[in-house]
Amino acid sequence: DTIQFCRYAKMVSDLGANVILEVQKPLVRLLKDLTGVSTLIAKGDPLPEFDFHCPMLSLPLAFKTDLNSIPSAKSYLEAEAERVAYWKNRIKGDGIKIGIAWQGSHGTKIDIGRSFELKLFKNIADLNNVQLISLQKGYGSEQLRNMPQGMQVMDLGEELDADGAFLDSAAVITNLDLVITSDTALAHLAGALGIKTWVALKFVPEWRWMLDRQDSPWYPSLKLYRQEKMDEWASVFDQMQIDINSIPYGSI
């Protein structure tokens, strides 16, 4: 939610306010250069004096946001330049570089039905000129040790985001041609970075993805692939494979 709605800080700033933005401590470095923010503090740290307060997720209501007025900039976050350069060298190689993630936060109610198994990427991994790179952290990453025979996915290991939430993920994503992910924070991160991203959605997704549309008014760089039937992912990945095959090499 923070990555999606921190964009409203600029709108508040444009009204003439000095914006003090309080976010989860792990996100402070990621958001340190966010446009419109005068002071960025970690949740729980002492607050400076302020005149007004508004919960971040109430800002869409405060600005009377509707479908036609969603602030949908091409991008509003930027990865650290040194990390971008480091990961560019780390993942260098031929082919279309596709970052993948398949598992959301385990054991939470929101995760029911939204995650899928890594092995569903097998047919995409087998395509010519495709290099899959894992963006998965924590639970779910153990599937990298038990992939179908012949399936290759680059594992970035414990080094990824060792210094803070999403710092390396943002840098890796900046170097990718495409991200394919389940409905996780990585979808929001890639969208906020303006990187071409395909999101696989369960049959009844979260409210923010709406219904009956392939685009997202929140993130212009996203394309949504929806389940046709509950708990059925095969058709989603079949369509992705078709779409990748239809992309001329070098034009993604």
Task: Label each PLM-derived region with a short phrase.
Residues T2-I252:
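Catalytic machinery of carbohydrate-active enzymes
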